[in-house]
Amino acid sequence: MRPEVEQELAHTLLLELLAYQFASPVRWIETQDVILSPPVSAERIVEIGPSPTLAGMAKRTLKLKYENMDAALSINREVLCYSKDAREIYYNFEDEVADEPAEAPASTSSTPKVETAAAAAPAATPAPAPAQTSAPAAALPDEPPKALEVLHTLVAQKLKKSIEEVSPQKSIKDLVGGKSTLQNEILGDLQKEFGATPEKPEEVPLDELGAIMQSSFNGSLGKQSSSLISRMISSKMPGGFNNSAVRGYLGNRYGLGPGRLESVLLLALTMEPASRLGSEADAKAWLDSVAQKYAARNGVTLSSPTAEGGSSSGSAAVIDEETFKKLTKNNTMLVTQQLELFARYLNKDLRAGQKAQVAEKVISDTLRAQLDLWNEEHGEFYASGIAPIFSPLKARVYDSDWNWARQDALKMFFDIIFGRLKHVDTEIVARCISVMNRSNPTLLEFMQYHIDHCPAEKGETYQLAKTLGQQLIDNCKSVIDAPPVFKNVNHPTAPSTTIDERGNLNYEEIPRPGVRKLTHYVTEMAKGGKLPTESKNKAKVQNDLARIYRIIKSQNKMSRSSKLQIKQLYGQVLHALSLPLPSSNDEQTPVKETIPFLHIRKKSVDGNWEFNKSLTGTYLDVLESGAKNGITYQDKYALVTGAGAGSIGAQIVEGLLAGGAKVVVTTSRFSRKVTEFYQSLYTRHGSRGSCLIVVPFNQGSKTDVEALIDYIYDEKKGLGWNLDYIVPFAAIPENGREIDGIDSRSEFAHRIMLTNILRLLGAVKSQKASRGMDTRPAQVILPLSPNHGTFGNDGLYSESKLGLETLFNRWYSESWANYLTICGAVIGWTRGTGLMAPNNIVSQGIEKYGVRTFSQSEMAFNILGLMSQKVVDLCQSEPIYANLNGGLELLPDLKDLSTRLRTELLETAEIRRAVAAETAFDHSITNGPDSEAVFQKTAIQPRANLKFNFPKLKPYEALSHLSDLRGMVDLEKVPVVTGFSEVGPWGNSRTRWDMECYGEFSLEGCVEIAWIMGLIKNFNGKGKDGKPYSGWVDTKTGEPVDDKDVKAKYEKYILEHCGIRIIEAELFHGYNPEKKELLQEVVIDHDLEPFEASKEAAHEFKLRHGDQVEIFEIPDSTEWSVRFKRGTSMLIPKALRFDRFVAGQIPLGWDPKRYGIPDDIISQVDPTTLYVLVSTVEALVASGITDPYECYKYIHVSELGNTVGSGIGGMSALRGMYKDRWTDKPVQKDILQESFINTANAWINMLLLSASGPIKTPVGACATAVESVDAAVDLITSGKARICISGGYDDFSEEGSYEFANMGATSNAAKETERGRTPQEMSRPATSTRDGFMESQGAGVQIIMQAKLAIEMGVPIHGIVGYVSTAMDKQGRSVPAPGQGILTGAREIATKTPLPIVDLKFRSRQLQRRRSQIGEWAEREYLYLEEELDAMKVQNPDLDLEAYRIERINVIKEEVVRQEKEALNTFGNEFWKRDPTIAPIRGALAVWGLTIDDLGVASFHGTSTKANEKNECDVIDSQLTHLGRSKGNAVYGVFQKYLTGHSKGGAGAWMLNGALQILRSGFVPGNRNADNIDEYLARFDRVMFPSEGIQTDGIKAASVTAFGFGQVGGQVIVIHPDYIYGVIDEATYNAYKAKTAARYKASYRYTHDALVYNNLVRAKDSPPYTKEQEKAVYLNPLARASKSKAGTWTFPATLPAESDISKTNETTRTLQSLTTSLTNSNENVGVDVELVSAISIDNETFIERNFTDTERKYCFAAPNPQASFAGRWSAKEAVFKSLGISGKGAAAPLKDIEIISSESGAPEVVLHGEAAKAATTAGVKSVSVSISHDDNQSVSVALAHK
């Protein structure tokens, strides 16, 4: 055959084969047999295609089938592939290389050897060189990258794993773990890289795939790898360190050729830095690490650069500095001349800056000298101390007394109930007075409601609360129109210092003997002390002598010598008076004189201040009246400085507030702690009409003094007040400074305590004068002191106090008497103040000398008495000098006395300590060293006990009050919450609850949050010391951490990095609000310098900018040069300071890996999906479900639904899609799917559930979670699902934060900081200063389940979802505007009379009657069935009557169930629906026997925005009012977002979780940021705003409301789970308790295992059924899972074929007897059907009247007592009917008909009494009965035999 014919035939064959391959079914096996078998027996087979796919199959076929035959026939076959074996196919063999001749022997001549490889370079002239240079490293033999390298790298890079983590023995399909999108991405990258890939490359192991692709691989990197390398270098290398620099560095340093360079850069792709490297040194260090790793992987040794010339080259050439200067001198001169030439041309003075600097230096030196002088004169402390701090922005206003009154009254009510207040003591009286001072009509209604509804029958404490509460109400009514008063009822106290046997010195305040109350105190003060007459009169004598001396001295006619003699005599008399009085043994009692401890002095004619009895009497009368009746300061305005905690000033502020004054108090240490102190002070003492304003203020600053008074008096920018009182008590201590130690601090203290007090008074005078306020002078309480240098060592303190006394004279001599009045208070020894606290221990000793010391409250009472109206009136006539010194000035040598007393105490204590030590030593010697151990105290440290408790289940007897609910609700239509959890700023729901309730973590909470944040981990093994250890260890150090030490060790860090705080960049991709990045378009006006880029990037620049960019290929490089030309537009990043820099963030260190989520999932999904996964698993575990597949034991896979939703979805994914993709950053290819809101639901199902039930994905902005609950409840009640996962989630992001700010919706952190707010305070719902919501992030999830299923499974029930609804609002143009659509939940038409249907008892009666009717209908149907069977038999003799009977019985039974459910809906679950006279909320509560008054808590959406709280409070108050909530029954308002911030989609879920925790605990958490409630909200009197947690005696129901942007409103009402248990019988309840206990143990173990092994989330690898079972499981509604031997839940191989209800049952057998009996004339038949739910076994009267003791014992012992009683009751009724006798009415007892069990267990009838007589009369010889009952009904047939 000619060659051309062969060629033509081959071509035809090829075409035919290709056509056959593409157009026909694949029959390659047969085709191979034709080709390989005779007669063809092809020996050379060539595959034309991209990879050897068919060739590989042919090789395997040859080996399996033809290998032996070919060997026998000597056939040598060849299988080739076009893409791999082109050289063999075309016979392109290389020529053989001729053998090289053997190397000649080495020459022995001296002729130098000539190298042929390259000519020697000519020697160059040496040039100046650095001290040391490096030569390039020795070249490494080059080797191009292999296809496997490229393949391996691309796969690892896409999987975001290191090269070691990707096994080359695995296929792409195995590596991606079923992620089809990721697989497609990799295949696309390979296609882009290699051009062509084999068929199905994803199924071939990487090493095999690499080998296949190697044949066609040319050793050069393709587009994909080149692009990745260029992108990595441009995005991660420092500026200027481009592609060429990278390659040059690696080549020079390690001698790498082009091929190995590519390999190293490939490896670098799998080691890419997380962020751009900061410097070239960092970049080189990173490249070094890559190169070393490459060398280790490839088994090569990298050489390092060597010093040039090596060790034999000698020293490197070095040039000296002088020579270098000479060489460069001419160049420097030339450049300088050119610079000066250019300057002259531009008319610029090059020396202008230096000249200006000289002038500035003169000025600077002058100012510096002045500043140095000022600092030298005043000192550093003074200089820093006078800095102003006043800011009106930071003013805190507290005036919501109306709210705190209700809070205090309620707290007192529960304190009595819980036994914390058992007796009427001073504490309870003081609290009652405080409540009375705030009496108002709303408060009276509030208290009256609680007292009227206080169940006194519950115990003594309830009775006491009711009694005392009513007394308090009566007292409040009596003072409602009276002004508030300050009345101190505390016991006066005395100092007590004791020293115990061991030498411990103890000081305490004890009740003062004989002085029980303040009236006794005033009497004691009036009596004064009893000192000897001589001592008392000594001062008076001295004064009188001084006056005589002055008169004599004034005589002009007296000689000089006489005057001198008189002067000497005067001095001698004074000296004699100063001597101590001689002791007397005279038995006569000396005469004693007294003056009051507190008295008023009046200035005498000669200018001395003398005791004035009249004024003192007036003052003491005021004190006595104040002690009895109180003092009012209503409508008074006061300024108080120096009122820190523990000071007299703080006590004065308390008194002023209690008396109704408005007070400005200043503080020099403005902080949250300080403002919280004043806020709590106002909360306790603020009375009706009072107001407290706290401002930062430095009394040492003149600026602050003026600014403060301007603020107080300015009507527009300030308060617009007119002060009535000024109490300038600010001071700082100067201890330890004698006259030679007067320093900067002393001068500053003098400025505070004297100079600026005068300035402050002057400023007040100026303000009053400028406003014409001369008829209302302000009383100034001057803080005087008896210390006129007496103590010493106190700097200028005495001088400051003495200086104030000049105001007594200035009042007369200056012009401000009409504006200010002066009252000097000489303050005595006051125990416990900041200045006097160190002297407390000697107070008792001081008092023994007849002096009186005072407590802070006593001294404050003294001063407040000076501020009464009577004393104020006295001050307007003349300055008042009030001596409140307690006789201290009459005590000589006070300092020495104090020192002596202190020394005696300390010596006594020291002696006793020594004696105790000696005694202990003797005892230990005598009895052994351990003998005292039994007497020593040992502190027992609590250990953490992480319980994760389920709701507590009460004894069944405790639910007796709910017995009316029995059988009244269809539990199949009741949704309950069985588990919940969250991921939020405070960790999970348990740790958040700790903070919400108590403001701190419990020990258990602290351990758990420390684990969550990765601070501790569990360890079990050998510790660092080599000893076995099991427990917590520090994650960083590995050191053991005892759980009791966790709180002390980590709490500070935890609090700093949890909750609402300044944004932490590491949580948000490095986002820093201080440098919020934006882009601005800029057009360049000159050509830029060129830079390097890859070829692709260069052409992309060209495509975008056209002629405005030049690109050129760089010779000998793969890089291109790019230059942007003039006119190019660029987007240049810029930054601004963004003012929203605070947010609620998940705890720092929260790591999904710690919960067990695999790395590939973490890298794949959006962070919000991780939050939802963790929340879902925790919620399931909280439900007692440790394996979600267990659910399929009870339900079909189609009955588990998911309604989790979000407001926005995956924010990180959206950011990647839009921002990162646009900026050409690496982004995963399937990022789109992670941005979908339903993707989180998909991951829940794929990783955890494998459910096939309904899914709804709500998107309701901030109301998403409530919308989710609404959807879940719809699915449960409609029967579409029996279990639902509901919840919501959302993230915090830079983009969302910026846009919320643009809307003006969020809190401006910058402004809040200016106002002195900490990040934790910036969310303040319901307060008068709220100003925008605080964004947050996280997720919340609930497990909502059908109640019947929950009981059956034994899962815990946390609450009943009694009501849920969503609503839109009205027409408008504002999407975020708050609306009132959810008011429709209270819609109803009022009726004139109460509706009986709402009453549970009424509905119970109707339902009982309906059940009787259903039973009668069933009886008739069963009786008619026999007639029906006879008729059917006649019509169709071949009919299977037995099968027909079974089916008809089942139909009847199902119809009975259906009718009962219909009845339950009619009178139970849904009785209120579609009734316009019953509001949905009223009806939903009435189902459970509740009313609107039983709604205890309202959890508010409470976003901390102005509009929301006004609207939401209005909505709730309107709902409650419209539904008839009682006056005074204010609902507790819970505002959770003060703690968590606003997580948008997850907010409602967190609130619902909190509401469920409230139901479980009865504890209502307060809004701790509610420092002052908005006055506007006072109108909503049915809402209370607690700021502190309140432990109640139980909450029955709670409301949760949510308002979302976009017209979404929602409301959920959850009800206490006890009401579910009231529906079921005792046996069912006890069985449920047992199941729940078992589940708790499993959940407890699971949770602790998760903490130990970090495996909370245990992702599923497969569904619970096999691939073959999938369709069968979907299509069989009865398919249920079971537990395998391996402990997993799977579906059995054989699924149930028919329903259990279709099987023959007892009812069928029971009714079969009807056929025989109806045809027997000697038998009477009785049939009775009873619904199990109709039999009330809780009705003891019914049970006792109708059942014998034997029957009761039998039924109560049955597994289902109610069903057993129903069976016995139906049997009795059937027996009665079979007797055919007349009855005594429906109420007649049936006890005479007894049903007993025979030995075989069959029921037997025993007749007693009248029943036996009636049977005998009717001729009945015996009665037999058959009973059948299930969970729904009981059927009995009785036969009376005659």
Swiss-Prot record:
Acetyl-CoA binds at residues 1728-1730, 1754, 1764, 1773-1783, 1797-1800, 1827-1829. The modification Phosphoserine is found at residues 604, 1412. GO terms for molecular function: 3-oxoacyl-[acyl-carrier-protein] reductase (NADPH) activity; 3-oxoacyl-[acyl-carrier-protein] synthase activity; fatty acid synthase activity; fatty-acyl-CoA synthase activity; holo-[acyl-carrier-protein] synthase activity; magnesium ion binding. Residues 145-220 form the Carrier domain. The modification O-(pantetheine 4'-phosphoryl)serine is found at residue 180. SUPFAM superfamilies: 4'-phosphopantetheinyl transferase, FabD/lysophospholipase-like, NAD(P)-binding Rossmann-fold domains, Thiolase-like. Residues 116-139 have a biased composition (Low complexity). Mg(2+) binds at residues 1728-1730, 1828-1829. It comes from the Eukaryota. It catalyses: acetyl-CoA + n malonyl-CoA + 2n NADPH + 4n H(+) = a long-chain-acyl-CoA + n CoA + n CO2 + 2n NADP(+); a fatty acyl-[ACP] + malonyl-[ACP] + H(+) = a 3-oxoacyl-[ACP] + holo-[ACP] + CO2; a (3R)-hydroxyacyl-[ACP] + NADP(+) = a 3-oxoacyl-[ACP] + NADPH + H(+). One of its GO terms (biological process) is palmitic acid biosynthetic process. Coiled coil: none annotated. Changing residue 600 to N: In strain: H518. GO terms for cellular component: cytosol; fatty acid synthase complex. InterPro entries: 4-PPantetheinyl_Trfase_dom, 4-PPantetheinyl_Trfase_dom_sf, ACPS, Acyl_Trfase/lysoPLipase, Fas_alpha_ACP, FAS_alpha_su_C, FAS_alpha_yeast, FASI_helical. This is Fatty acid synthase subunit alpha. It comes from Schizosaccharomyces pombe (strain 972 / ATCC 24843) (Fission yeast).
